[in-house]
């Protein structure tokens, strides 16, 4: 009789111990949801987590990005060439017109993700043309990857035999996210599960089942999108779409108790753009100084004022540059401290 009881007690103690361990593990698991409109920089943040909190990119993984980088470079120059026609811009050198025609033809015939020498020579000649540069300066009037200038001005390096993409090359590469991508890593005794969700409108209906049990939402909005329209709808300003989306997320009943952090991203692109294009393009009521600080702060206020529960719910915001590893490292460190403070104080672990 006694032996049976003690075995039962032992089993009970073991079960209790396991339940306690499971509870601690759950308490240390952080579900992070990355949300934001298309091309705001969500996937770049995910790449940074791999660089900062995992082992970064192996040589093999870096080499896999070559095809993407070549594809991005070709898409960019083709977008500029097409815009030359729609914006009615003349080539600085009429010989470039033939180069442009040749390039269009080659783009349809080459193997995707490759960059033959003849093609890279044509692209480099086009990129140096004054008309192409004038068209590039008007990039907000058509759809162009943020990485266009980065890759096109460094194409000679990218096509050198034996080229291995650098971390920066990888960070600037762009593949549209479809579906949901999960990344797991540990930091400050926490186990993170980060979910990157496609930002284009057609992808958003896939978000809903990710919502349950989310610890923190990082909402990413591109500061530089204030003078741009959507890929999916050229009537809608990207900043307005981002504000609309943020409004629906931050005031959603699902997220009443969820920490929300706002990343105002692409501050590097914004700081250059604001020198040339006035914020009133997006916000006609804005009559403040058209400086990085004033305009940036005005955008931040537009987002934060959408929070209907300001008295009980604080939204933390950071200006970010997702391609800058040190900046992301610093900001994510601060975000983790917020998560610890907000969500884990109840479980007695911290």
Swiss-Prot record:
Residues 169-177 are annotated as: G2 motif. Residues 261-268 are annotated as: G4 motif. SUPFAM superfamilies: P-loop containing nucleoside triphosphate hydrolases, Transducin (alpha subunit), insertion domain. A lipid is attached at residue 2 (N-myristoyl glycine). Residues 31-44 are annotated as: G1 motif. It comes from the Eukaryota. GTP binds at residues 36-43, 146, 171-177, 199, 265-268, 322. One of its GO terms (biological process) is dopamine secretion. InterPro entries: Gprotein_alpha_I, Gprotein_alpha_su, GproteinA_insert, P-loop_NTPase. Residues 7-21 have a biased composition (Basic and acidic residues). Keywords: Cell projection, GTP-binding, Lipoprotein, Magnesium, Membrane, Metal-binding, Myristate, Nucleotide-binding, Phosphoprotein, Sensory transduction, Transducer, Vision. SMART domains: G_alpha. Pfam families: G-alpha. GO terms for molecular function: G-protein beta/gamma-subunit complex binding; GTP binding; GTPase activity; metal ion binding. Residues 340-350 are annotated as: Interaction with RHO. Residues 28-350 form the G-alpha domain. Its main location: other. Residues 1-21 are annotated as: Disordered. It is found in: Cell projection, Cilium, Photoreceptor outer segment; Membrane; Photoreceptor inner segment. Functions as a signal transducer for the rod photoreceptor RHO. Required for normal RHO-mediated light perception by the retina. Guanine nucleotide-binding proteins (G proteins) function as transducers downstream of G protein-coupled receptors (GPCRs), such as the photoreceptor RHO. The alpha chain contains the guanine nucleotide binding site and alternates between an active, GTP-bound state and an inactive, GDP-bound state. Activated RHO promotes GDP release and GTP binding. Signaling is mediated via downstream effector proteins, such as cGMP-phosphodiesterase. Belongs to the G-alpha family. G(i/o/t/z) subfamily. Heterotrimeric G proteins are composed of 3 subunits alpha, beta and gamma. The alpha chain contains the guanine nucleotide binding site. Interacts with RHO. Interacts with RGS9 and PDE6G. Interacts (when myristoylated) with UNC119; interaction is required for localization in sensory neurons. This is Guanine nucleotide-binding protein G(t) subunit alpha-1.
């Amino acid at each position: 009789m006694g032996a049976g009881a003690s075995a039962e007690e032992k089993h009970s103690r073991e079960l209790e111990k396991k339940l306690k361990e499971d509870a601690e593990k759950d308490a240390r698991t952080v579900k992070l949801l990355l949300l934001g409109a298309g091309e705001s920089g969500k996937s770049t943040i995910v790449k940074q987590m791999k660089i900062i909190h995992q082992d970064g990119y192996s040589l093999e993984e870096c080499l896999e990005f070559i095809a993407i980088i070549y594809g991005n470079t070709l898409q960019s120059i083709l977008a500029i060439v097409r815009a030359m026609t729609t914006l009615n811009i003349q080539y600085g050198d009429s010989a470039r017109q033939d180069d442009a025609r040749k390039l269009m033809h080659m783009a349809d015939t080459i193997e995707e993700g490759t960059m033959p020498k003849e093609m890279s020579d044509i692209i480099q000649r086009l990129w140096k043309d004054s008309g192409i540069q004038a068209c590039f300066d008007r990039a907000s009037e058509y759809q162009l990857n943020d990485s266009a200038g980065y890759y096109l001005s460094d194409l000679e390096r990218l096509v050198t035999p034996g080229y291995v993409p650098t971390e920066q090359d990888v960070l600037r590469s762009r593949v549209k996210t479809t579906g949901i991508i999960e990344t797991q890593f540990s930091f400050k005794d926490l186990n993170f599960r980060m979910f990157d969700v496609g930002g284009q409108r057609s992808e958003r209906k896939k978000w809903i089942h990710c919502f349950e049990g989310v610890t923190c939402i990082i909402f990413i909005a591109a500061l530089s999108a204030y003078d741009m329209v959507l890929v999916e709808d050229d009537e809608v300003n990207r900043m307005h779409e981002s504000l609309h989306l943020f409004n629906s997320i931050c005031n959603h009943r699902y997220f009443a108790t969820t920490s929300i952090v706002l990343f105002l991203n692409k501050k590097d692109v914004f700081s250059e753009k604001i020198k040339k294009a006035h914020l009133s393009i997006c916000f006609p009521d804005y009559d403040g100084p058209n400086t990085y600080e004033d305009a940036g702060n005005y955008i931040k206020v537009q987002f934060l004022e959408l929070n209907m529960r300001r008295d009980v719910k604080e939204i933390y915001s950071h200006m970010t540059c997702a391609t800058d590893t040190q900046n992301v490292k610093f900001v994510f460190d601060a975000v983790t401290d917020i998560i610890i403070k907000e969500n884990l104080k109840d479980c007695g672990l911290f």
